[in-house]
Amino acid sequence: MKIGVFVPIGNNGWLISTTAPQYMPTFELNKAIVQKAEHYHFDFALSMIKLRGFGGKTEFWDHNLESFTLMAGLAAVTSRIQIYATAATLTLPPAIVARMASTIDSISGGRFGVNLVTGWQKPEYDQMGIWPGDEYFSRRYDYLTEYVQVLRDLWGTGKSDFKGDYFTMNDCRVSPQPSTPMKVICAGQSDAGMAFSAQHADFNFCFGKGVNTPAAFAPTAARMKDAAEKTGRDVGSYVLFMVIADETDEAARAKWEHYKAGADEDALSWLTEQSQKDTRSGADTNVRQMADPTSAVNINMGTLVGSYASVAKMLDEVASVPGAEGVLLTFDDFLQGVETFGERIQPLMECRSHIPAVTREVA
């Protein structure tokens, strides 16, 4: 099973809490995280894009770096780990993304790929005057289908004359082209999102579900597997989890309860309000899960809380789910979390037994 790190491009990572670690996103922080991840044989690093945060006492995600420029910098200071940036497709023409991706492919020596997102939080785009109207919610995957076709044309042949409802290319050129086939990833959980990923993505991200229920996402992976089979393609699921680990189950649980007790209610109210704007995509979208009050303090990603051995066992259970090809991990404390994972958790995982033992890196 592949292991990735979801780097904290926004302040405070993925814990919407006054009692969680408070920090700003910087290049130096993300450089240290990704270099540690590479040292411990993580397979990939991904950054999201967020253009407006949730406010509240913690100013959650009000402070964010930009994904492509961050990952270009990280590509230059790593040598093995795969690097993925996220394109907010309403803000960037596909020909520009194609050229930026080709540039980072050159920087990384063929280790780069692109995560495509349609956009769900209206204020991110309204603040710039580029929100296309609420009808966009129902046609966003039509838009993204044309977008990815332009990308594939330009990466594949260096030229596009695509004509569609949203994009018109007139002998559009991009050169040099990527040195290796460019990976495209998505995070669809609605029926429309999964149908898009089945047709166009190399793999699909989905949320884990619940606390210490590592296989609860299995129905989502099964839906993705079924959708891919209809297209004759193999599109695996990569599952998002937060790891909160300690020497004992009790110590890890105490951390988790401490973070929940400090939940930033004002920021969570903003998330809930925004999640209700899309009335056209169904009840199974990522953003609806994010806002579920069950575990909104970490946007309801799957959460693995326990001793190092307990977390290792739960990750092996994830690996046993049909269609699950990888996990994307976040941590309450990223620098310590990546190191602890590499030294204390990964060596106990059967699905990572092929990874050589690694000692702590020398500063």
UniProtKB/Swiss-Prot annotation:
One of its GO terms (biological process) is alkanesulfonate catabolic process. Signal peptide: none annotated. Keywords: Flavoprotein, FMN, Monooxygenase, NADP, Oxidoreductase. CDD domains: Alkanesulfonate_monoxygenase. Its EC number is 1.14.99.46. SUPFAM superfamilies: Bacterial luciferase-like. It holds the Pfam family Bac_luciferase. It catalyses: uracil + FMNH2 + NADH + O2 = (Z)-3-ureidoacrylate + FMN + NAD(+) + H2O + H(+); thymine + FMNH2 + NADH + O2 = (Z)-2-methylureidoacrylate + FMN + NAD(+) + H2O + H(+). FMN binds at residues 49-50, 115, 124, 140-141, 190. InterPro entries: Luciferase-like_dom, Luciferase-like_sf, Pyrimidine_monooxygenase_RutA, SsuD_RutA_monooxygenase. It comes from the Bacteria. One of its GO terms (molecular function) is alkanesulfonate monooxygenase activity. Belongs to the NtaA/SnaA/DszA monooxygenase family. RutA subfamily. PANTHER family: ALKANESULFONATE MONOOXYGENASE, ALKANESULFONATE MONOOXYGENASE-RELATED. HAMAP family: RutA. The FMN-N(5)-oxide reacts spontaneously with NADH to produce FMN. Requires the flavin reductase RutF to regenerate FMN in vivo. This is Pyrimidine monooxygenase RutA.
